């Protein structure tokens, strides 16, 4: 179960970084 918790935290961190970059720079993907 430790691996599951580690993956969850890692995914959350990646999500935060992704949104931070998305809001900092204009969206270049799509549209």
Swiss-Prot record:
Keywords: Membrane, Photosynthesis, Photosystem II, Thylakoid, Transmembrane, Transmembrane helix
Transmembrane segments: 3-23
Coiled coil: none
GO cellular component entries: photosystem II reaction center; plasma membrane-derived thylakoid membrane
Compartments (UniProt record): Cellular thylakoid membrane
Assigned protein family: Belongs to the PsbT family.
Subunit-structure text: PSII is composed of 1 copy each of membrane proteins PsbA, PsbB, PsbC, PsbD, PsbE, PsbF, PsbH, PsbI, PsbJ, PsbK, PsbL, PsbM, PsbT, PsbX, PsbY, PsbZ, Psb30/Ycf12, peripheral proteins PsbO, CyanoQ (PsbQ), PsbU, PsbV and a large number of cofactors. It forms dimeric complexes.
PANTHER family in alphabetical order: PHOTOSYSTEM II REACTION CENTER PROTEIN T, PTHR36411
Name this polypeptide is given: Photosystem II reaction center protein T
Organism: Trichodesmium erythraeum (strain IMS101)
